[in-house]
């Protein structure tokens, strides 16, 4: 491996709030893929960390799913804050200071399997900034109660303990600890972490724009507004697309830390030839959630099936809108040609029997499923939304204006009725997907992390 392709010597972790296959869509695929990239670039046993409060039993099942699916090499690479608190909490026994609950604040007690109180968490109902409040978190240890400065203090104390573990194992008390933060709420909570041995790198997974997500000058509010105010605090910020990086830099400024490294996919075996597929089968693969606007595809379908009577639309994925979408299918009278299949573990097999991949999404950070479909040789019909479809599709598909049902219908009809055009687009698909292969993306990610490591911490005082 060339020096430029290898990470600087340090310990590396990726950190999210919750990372769960089947619950967190493409995010739960992209994060462990980044973990693998780190290891391939020379990181020593990088970890995937989470801070959600599900039970240890739920976390154990989620970890096993990552291992069984080939996403993470072994369960020991995944750790959770609350699992470790419930197993004793002694790693935080030296954190914080003696004390108790903050007066006037409601608390929730977390207990272990034996009923012993382990930690007391402040509760802030309907407060979007709960993670930034300073009310004490109380950790019960064998040496007595310790208080930490809110959830920020809790997260930092846990990460400090892991960093110290790794330093002790390496025999180097000054070893750098690099946290690749995958969740904005967590990133916000870490900007006061001023240890000069820590580097904080933040990745982006979605559009920062408010609905309807197509105006780069629209007022940015809520979580995104708060997060953008913290841009200067990160040692590197990794955007999934050039378009989003450029629009954010133009509007909010680039502190000299912006990089682009898309989420990766595995290319897999060579796809089936276009002629061997069901020529009139269209497939969608996404969460059944408002962002994905599957309703637009369903509304476009009556015109498609009128023009191509044997056309079939297979929709794979689950989510809160499943019943609503099924009702729409029934209302439009297309239940014979539109099927909501639910989640599938046979993604490639589904792609290999289809002729066209369709997404009618309202916005994206990158659109990982587009790259996955391209890797299987599928032409893509996508709404031309910010961000990702335009950069991914290239000359391997058709982009249509967001929200235009007639344009969706016309694009699908045009491809389903033109075998030659489908074959032409399919021939370009694999090359388009190659831009998202690990070997293509790794140099950009390494460059971002190298820049962070080779400069002093932006938070050190």
PLM-predicted stretches and their roles:
Residues 243, 264:
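Carbohydrate-associated surface elements
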Residues 280, 284-303, 308, 313-315, ...:
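A conserved mid-protein helix/loop that constitutes part of the nucleotide-sugar donor-binding site
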Residues 343, 362:
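Aromatic "clamp/platform" in nucleotide-sugar-dependent glycosyltransferases that forms part
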Residues 379-383:
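Short hydrophobic beta-strand element within catalytic cores of glycosyltransferases
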Residues 163-167, 207, 216-237:
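Membrane-proximal helix-turn-helix segments that form the acceptor-binding/catalytic region
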Residues 438-461:
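C-terminal alpha-helical cap of glycosyltransferases
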Residues 394, 398-406, 414-420, 434:
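Conserved acidic donor-binding segment of nucleotide-sugar-dependent glycosyltransferases
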